[in-house]
């Protein structure tokens, strides 16, 4: 299938309007052309600096503009971040994402951020950060420290964007994505469904993502988590089939990207999640929280994977992490595979 960067809103709406079964069938066909089937990549997300964000994103409980139950916390110590990363690896995550509630990182924070990146990389995990807007120099610094992915969502269509955020422009977001790409990092960028946007806006979001010069390597699709105290706490729920349709169309439009089920998965039953995987989702966040919102427990995810026959992407194991029992097993295997005396010599008496 041709990878395109010239989609129109009309084309995307036509896909969204297809019969549900036909759309899922097409999305699954596209998915299997570009990705291992029955395979999901697992990430863990940690809030390394929580609350008191100067931005006015109407969906976000971390905004200083709204009264929510989120407490203000300073930038987390490097040791605590690395401890959380090790626990994430032990639980099966292959990527560790670190998020800070900032408009943009300050230069005084860059040394600590780079230390976090290097420490997580040393564990054999992929690294991702979401810190707000970046300058070209900051993007270069993070890339040189070894950051693999940078997350910066577009959130919604350009037309609906002003109804949700006024403290940074849509172009600000696109500029940050450009700086990230120029620095050689991979892009994680998606949006949020259920903020009161129209079908046109949902189509417009996917058009913006798919028409970037290079598709994002990871496309998180979030279902709004309504939080008391935010302006969007009373919006209508997303129709589950509409959400699954969006996953399917994202897969068709960006066939080589990972499509991630992100915020809102806690509200999805197993059947809805299964449909999302059928539609082409092949990545999830794993663990108890996504920044400040709940996420399904690890045990429930593993049970669902078992029911569906889904395999997790495995963490690359470093030589010094091989356990004594694993080493013994390997020795036994090698000894068993060695030729015996009867294999090497014939018995002249026979």
UniProtKB/Swiss-Prot annotation:
Protein name: Biotin synthase
Residues involved in [2Fe-2S] cluster binding: 97, 128, 188, 260
Keywords: 2Fe-2S, 4Fe-4S, Biotin biosynthesis, Iron, Iron-sulfur, Metal-binding, S-adenosyl-L-methionine, Transferase
GO biological process: biotin biosynthetic process
Function: Catalyzes the conversion of dethiobiotin (DTB) to biotin by the insertion of a sulfur atom into dethiobiotin via a radical-based mechanism.
Organism this protein belongs to: Vibrio cholerae serotype O1 (strain ATCC 39315 / El Tor Inaba N16961)
Lineage of the organism: Bacteria, Pseudomonadati, Pseudomonadota, Gammaproteobacteria, Vibrionales
NCBIfam families registered for this protein in UniProt: bioB
EC code(s) of this entry: 2.8.1.6
Keyword presence, Manganese: no
Binding site for [4Fe-4S] cluster: 53, 57, 60
Reaction catalysis annotation: (4R,5S)-dethiobiotin + (sulfur carrier)-SH + 2 reduced [2Fe-2S]-[ferredoxin] + 2 S-adenosyl-L-methionine = (sulfur carrier)-H + biotin + 2 5'-deoxyadenosine + 2 L-methionine + 2 oxidized [2Fe-2S]-[ferredoxin]
Pathway(s) per entry: Cofactor biosynthesis; biotin biosynthesis; biotin from 7,8-diaminononanoate: step 2/2
């Amino acid at each position: 299938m041709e990878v395109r960067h010239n989609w129109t809103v009309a084309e995307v709406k036509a896909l969204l309007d297809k019969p549900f079964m036909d759309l899922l069938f097409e999305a699954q066909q596209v998915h299997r052309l570009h990705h291992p089937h029955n395979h999901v990549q697992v990430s863990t997300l940690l809030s390394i600096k929580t609350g008191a964000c100067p931005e006015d994103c109407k969906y976000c409980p971390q905004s200083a503009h709204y009264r929510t139950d989120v407490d203000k916390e300073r930038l987390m110590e490097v040791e605590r971040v690395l401890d959380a990363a090790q626990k994430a690896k032990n639980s099966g995550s292959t990527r560790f994402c670190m998020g800070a509630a900032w408009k943009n990182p300050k230069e005084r924070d860059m040394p600590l951020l780079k230390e976090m990146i290097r420490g997580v990389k040393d564990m054999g995990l992929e690294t991702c950060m979401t810190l707000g807007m970046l300058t070209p120099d900051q993007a270069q610094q993070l890339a040189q420290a070894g950051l693999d992915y940078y997350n910066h969502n577009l959130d919604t269509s350009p037309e609906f964007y002003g109804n949700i955020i006024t403290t940074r422009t849509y172009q600000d977001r696109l500029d940050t994505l450009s700086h990230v790409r120029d620095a050689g990092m991979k892009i994680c960028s998606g949006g949020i469904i259920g903020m009161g946007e129209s079908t046109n806006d949902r189509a417009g979001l996917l058009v913006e993502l798919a028409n970037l010069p290079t598709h994002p390597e990871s496309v998180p699709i979030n279902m709004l988590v309504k939080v008391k105290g935010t302006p969007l706490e009373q919006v209508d729920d997303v129709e589950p089939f509409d959400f699954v349709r969006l996953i399917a169309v994202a897969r068709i439009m960006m066939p080589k990207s990972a499509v991630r089920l992100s915020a809102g998965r806690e509200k999805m039953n197993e059947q809805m999640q299964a449909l999302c995987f059928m539609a082409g989702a092949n990545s999830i966040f794993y663990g108890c929280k996504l920044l400040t919102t709940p996420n399904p427990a690890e045990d429930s995810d593993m049970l669902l994977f078992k029911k569906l026959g889904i395999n997790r992407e495995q963490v690359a194991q470093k030589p010094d992490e091989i356990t004594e029992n694993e080493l013994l097993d390997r020795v036994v295997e090698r000894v068993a595979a060695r030729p015996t005396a009867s294999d090497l010599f014939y018995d002249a008496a026979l």
